[in-house]
Amino acid sequence: MARQVICWCFTLNNPLSPLSLHDSMKYLVYQTEQGEAGNIHFQGYIEMKKRTSLAGMKKLIPGAHFEKRRGTQGEARAYSMKEDPRLEGPWEYEEFVPTIEDKLREVMNDMKITGKRPIEYIEECCNTYDKSASTLREFRGELKKKKAISSWELQRKPWMDEVDALLQERDGRRIIWVYGPQGGEGKTSYAKHLVKTRDAFYSTGGKTADIAFAWDHQELVLFDFPRSFEEYVNYGVIEQLKNGIIQSGKYQSVIKYSDYVEVIVFANFTPRSGMFSEDRIVYVYA
């Protein structure tokens, strides 16, 4: 048996008083049962807030027999709430929150269902994700990102409603070009708003290899070009992302695919003539 674990199943024979949720417990469920030999006992399942030893568990419920949970969360909970041979209960303390087992197959199955990106498992399934210093740096970056995003506020402008309406149409064949020549129209603030509310991919431009490597299949792609970038806009990478297929040659060659990508460009200038088909550009004047 593992020395310290989070999840424990237990049996307490001939209980004298009800159980209660200890401060160290995150979740508790149990019921009174009668065994085949007629013995009365509590059958239950506990999730601790942190890893706890067998000795520690026995201090919480003296006389109980504990075993490390072997099946899934749901199976352990169901076993502690089964109708036969229940006498009383079940009693449940705190909300039962299913989590993903930190195993590669479980994470892969969850990705199929939820569409989550790998980075979203970095905290909950850190062993499956990776055990390395680079993971810690990436996790720290995510914490910094979440803190920054939470502070972003938006002062709405009328042109933003037009973009919102366009996004409701879900047309991956076009490029929305938000043009504001003067500056100060709120283009960057609105781009930040889309990062915060729609998990958009944000870029100020660059080499195709760098952008393709950084893009993690987000459906909404934003290019927020500074005024000084007009002569260096990478029109090819915009087109590739709009098409939902792009080759990344950074570190290792890989082709990334997506069935739907919406691209928005924020700029103080309009695109160079002939770079895109005119019927693919939708202008919004900020």
From Swiss-Prot:
Molecular function per GO: ATP binding; ATP hydrolysis activity; DNA binding; endonuclease activity; metal ion binding; nucleotidyltransferase activity; RNA binding; RNA helicase activity
UniProt motif RCR-3: location: 79-82
Active site positions: 79
Record-listed a divalent metal cation binding positions: 33, 41, 84
Keywords, sorted A to Z: ATP-binding, Covalent protein-DNA linkage, DNA replication, DNA-binding, Endonuclease, Helicase, Host nucleus, Hydrolase, Metal-binding, Multifunctional enzyme, Nuclease, Nucleotide-binding, Nucleotidyltransferase, Transferase
Catalytic activity: ATP + H2O = ADP + phosphate + H(+)
Localization: Host nucleus
Cofactor binding note: Divalent metal cations, possibly Mg(2+) or Mn(2+).
Outcome following mutation: residue 79 to F: Complete loss of DNA cleavage and nucleotidyl transfer activity
Domain named CRESS-DNA virus Rep endonuclease: residues: 2-96
Listed EC numbers: 2.7.7.-, 3.1.21.-, 3.6.1.-
Top-level lineage group: Viruses
PROSITE patterns from the UniProt entry: CRESS_DNA_REP (PS52020)
Any GO BP: DNA replication
Residues at which ATP binds: 186-188
Binding partners and assembly: Homooligomer (Potential). Rep binds to repeated DNA motifs (iterons).
Domain notes: There are 3 rolling circle replication (RCR) motifs. RCR-2 is probably involved in metal coordination. RCR-3 is required for phosphodiester bond cleavage for initiation of RCR.
General remark: The genome of nanoviruses is composed of six to eight segments. In addition, some isolates contain subviral DNAs.
Protein name: Master replication protein
Name of the gene: DNA-R
